[in-house]
From Swiss-Prot:
GO biological process, alphabetically ordered: cell division; regulation of division septum assembly
Protein known as: Cell division topological specificity factor
Lineage, opening ranks: Bacteria, Pseudomonadati, Pseudomonadota, Gammaproteobacteria, Lysobacterales
Listed transmembrane segments: none
Function according to Swiss-Prot or TrEMBL: Prevents the cell division inhibition by proteins MinC and MinD at internal division sites while permitting inhibition at polar sites. This ensures cell division at the proper site by restricting the formation of a division septum at the midpoint of the long axis of the cell.
Keywords linked to the UniProt accession: Cell cycle, Cell division
Top-rank taxon, per record: Bacteria
UniProt xrefs under InterPro entries: MinE, MinE_sf
Family listed: Belongs to the MinE family.
Keyword Cell cycle in annotation: yes
Length: 86
């Protein structure tokens, strides 16, 4: 209800920063069991893709997903829409 919104306590920037930090820590803890080569693999993939397409650093995501008895390497690359040459 819009009428009672002013009675709610506003979130402070400290609370927002704390929530974001908790998310980052949770992600780091979940990646702790993963192999050490994933960050290097991500950087090398980015370098190879940049030879052919002009992409952003955040365009390549590399994750290791445990699926039962198998580990699945999930690689996601967001390519630009147009003919963008390096």
């Amino acid at each position: 209800m819009g009428l009672f919104d002013f009675l709610k306590a506003k979130k402070t920037t400290a609370e927002t920063a704390k929530n974001r930090l908790q998310i980052i820590i949770a992600q780091e803890r979940s990646n702790r069991g993963g192999p050490d080569y994933l960050p290097l693999l991500q950087r090398e993939l980015l370098e190879v893709i940049k030879k052919y397409v002009n992409i952003d650093v955040d365009a390549v995501k590399v994750d290791l997903v445990k699926d039962g008895q198998h580990d699945v390497l999930d690689i996601s690359v967001a390519l630009p829409e147009g003919p963008d040459k390096p």
